[in-house]
Regions:
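Glycine-rich phosphate-binding loops of nucleotide-dependent enzymes
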Residues: 2-252
Length: 252
């Protein structure tokens, strides 16, 4: 593995007597796609919420770029270089694709913004939005209201909004949800490209996509880690086959 930029040790989150995430330890390196897979209710989204600071852990630790980040809130986690997308598309539908990305870029400005100064006056913000759209291949769609874009393009816009905040670590929660084969292939190609300059932690149910793009996998069941390893190790793991992959294949 290259330089480890995101690492958890024994990360745990209780809701009352339920351990939604229980003792999860994993590491993600720069230039790596680390996929977290598992059946519904395994704790995958709760794990991402812990990593993004949207939820505080009940126990365990988290490091970002070698420094302790345990229990930090989402704003501080974001400023440390972490961006996330959500399971459900989280965009401003009436606004254009460019305006969505510009809003995201504004959220990372360290200088104060004058209330009566138009957003268009901030060149660095507009440039960040344009770069983000170009990174996801939608530079020609910037002037279109997001409501008029396809579902796949809306998911790309959400990733572009994440990129507009200039993260080094991407937490992506089911970016291929609800997509057809052509749209999925486009997102997989995008993830491959982004992995060259980012660490990506990916939660996804599309196993074809996962095995096409992941460098490492963690399998979760009932909040705990069942197995971790390279794709070929996970694919041949009998416990994983019985608990998850076998059920996935039977359902197809």
């Amino acid at each position: 593995m290259s330089e480890v930029v995101l690492e958890t040790t024994g990360l745990t989150r209780h809701f009352g007597g339920l351990a939604a995430v229980n003792g999860v330890s994993l590491a993600c390196g720069m230039g790596e796609v680390h996929a977290v897979i598992g059946p519904n209710g395994a704790g995958k989204t709760t794990l991402i919420n812990l990593l993004s600071g949207d939820l505080p852990p009940s126990d365990g630790t988290m490091k970002l770029f070698g420094s302790d980040a345990t229990g930090l809130g989402p704003e501080r986690i974001s400023r440390l270089g972490v961006g996330r997308s959500y399971q459900k598309t989280n965009v401003f539908l009436p606004f254009t694709a460019f305006e969505n990305c510009r809003l995201a870029a504004q959220s990372r400005m360290r200088t104060s913004m004058r209330f009566f100064r138009p957003a268009t006056a901030y060149r660095e913000v507009s440039e960040a939005a344009e770069r983000a759209l170009a990174e996801v291949g939608l530079e020609d769609r910037g002037g279109i209201p997001v409501a008029a874009l396809s579902h796949g393009e809306q998911r790309q816009i959400e990733i572009a909004m994440t990129l507009a905040t200039r993260p080094k670590v991407l937490l992506l929660d089911e970016p291929l949800a609800g997509m057809g084969a052509e749209e999925s292939a486009r997102i997989v190609a995008l993830l491959r490209k982004l992995s060259r300059s980012h660490a990506i932690l990916l939660v996804e149910h599309d196993m074809d996509a996962v095995f096409a793009v992941a460098d490492a996998l963690t399998v979760m069941v009932n909040g705990t880690v069942l197995a971790s390893g390279r794709p070929e190790e996970i694919r041949s793991n009998r416990a994983v086959q019985e608990a998850y992959l076998g059920a996935e294949e039977a359902a197809q």
